[in-house]
């Protein structure tokens, strides 16, 4: 049995003074020796925390004693250690950012909830568009079979992508999904205000679908990206597959790294061998960038040799 747990949760509810709440909540979390990342806004709370089983259970009881969060659902993962290095509770304008001119309140408008078994039926329906509401790098390491991959790098780009592809989605049944459900609460509501009529969402997100005793994560390919030190977690308990592809050679891969150029920091899938071969950098420009954190540890001679090994030249050698 694991000694630690990771809790994923959110709740759209009114918080009158997010800044004061954040300070008090941070103090409470630290007292319970939790680590994690929590966003607080006037519209609610969105968090992931890790801690010992005893500490996380205490936290869930603590939240249940607050009427605003008494019915909040926690997605619970067993873990061998903390999933975060520190504890942060930050006040924000939104708990998920769509950055709309007119914000959407999921308590007033949101898509129809589909439970995991209903969502599985939708996955098998050829007349339904399954729309991934996550970022491109989240999709690339794992997604539902047949889902549409929006070409976006952050959530606030999604409405623009929808408008650009409106003709392909018009008059279609749309079912959207995300990690734990919070993004879809707001996004599905926006879809309805934007004129799409038949809009549904996976209730509780991928995390809930993967733990459901009937679906057991079936029809999910790859792993689910998570925003903590675990990076990705398994979902499909029936017939797991690998869909991630190494950025450099296209071979199956589920290992994410960040480009060593801090001005880039792009997340790419790469094996240990290719990380070393390509100097943990996504491009030649990033490899030769003076701020590159990987190449700073190399001597000039070794840097030149490593570049030549992949048929590249250092700037100093260019005439």
UniProtKB/Swiss-Prot annotation:
It holds the Pfam family UPF0176_N. Residues 124-218 form the Rhodanese domain. Disulfide bonds: none annotated. One of its GO terms (biological process) is tRNA modification. It comes from the Bacteria. Its EC number is 1.14.-.-. The active site is at residue 178. It catalyses: uridine(34) in tRNA + AH2 + O2 = 5-hydroxyuridine(34) in tRNA + A + H2O. Keywords: Oxidoreductase, tRNA processing. SMART domains: RHOD (SM00450). The keyword S-adenosyl-L-methionine does not apply. The keyword tRNA processing applies. One of its GO terms (molecular function) is oxidoreductase activity, acting on paired donors, with incorporation or reduction of molecular oxygen. Catalyzes oxygen-dependent 5-hydroxyuridine (ho5U) modification at position 34 in tRNAs. Belongs to the TrhO family. This is tRNA uridine(34) hydroxylase. It comes from Listeria welshimeri serovar 6b (strain ATCC 35897 / DSM 20650 / CCUG 15529 / CIP 8149 / NCTC 11857 / SLCC 5334 / V8). The gene is trhO.
């Amino acid at each position: 049995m694991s000694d630690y747990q990771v809790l994923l949760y959110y709740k759209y509810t009114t918080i009158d003074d997010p800044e004061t709440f954040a300070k008090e909540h941070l103090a409470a979390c630290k007292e319970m020796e939790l680590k994690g990342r929590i966003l607080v806004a006037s519209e609610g709370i969105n968090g992931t925390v890790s801690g010992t089983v005893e500490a996380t259970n205490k936290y869930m009881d603590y939240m249940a004693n607050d009427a605003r969060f008494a019915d909040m659902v926690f997605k619970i993962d067993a873990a061998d250690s903390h999933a975060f290095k520190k504890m942060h509770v930050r006040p924000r304008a939104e708990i998920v950012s769509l950055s709309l001119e007119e914000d959407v309140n999921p308590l007033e408008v949101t898509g129809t909830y589909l439970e995991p078994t209903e969502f599985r039926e939708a996955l098998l329906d050829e007349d339904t568009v399954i729309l991934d509401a996550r970022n491109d790098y989240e999709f690339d390491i794992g997604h539902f079979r047949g889902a549409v991959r929006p070409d976006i790098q952050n959530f606030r780009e999604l409405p623009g992508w929808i408008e650009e592809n409106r003709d392909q989605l018009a008059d279609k049944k749309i079912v959207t999904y995300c990690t734990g459900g919070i993004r879809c609460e707001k996004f599905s509501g926006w879809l309805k205000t934007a004129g799409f009529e038949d809009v549904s969402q996976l209730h509780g997100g991928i995390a809930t679908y993967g733990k459901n005793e009937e679906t057991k994560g079936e029809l999910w390919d790859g792993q689910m990206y998570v925003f903590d030190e675990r990076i990705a977690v398994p979902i499909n308990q029936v017939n797991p597959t690998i869909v991630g592809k190494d950025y450099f050679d296209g071979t199956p891969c589920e290992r994410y790294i960040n480009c060593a150029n801090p001005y880039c920091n792009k997340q790419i899938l790469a094996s240990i061998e290719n990380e070393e071969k390509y100097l943990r950098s996504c491009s030649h420009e990033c490899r030769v960038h003076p701020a590159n954190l990987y190449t700073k540890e190399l001597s000039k001679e070794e840097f030149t040799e490593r570049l030549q090994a992949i048929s590249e030249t250092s700037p100093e050698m260019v005439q």
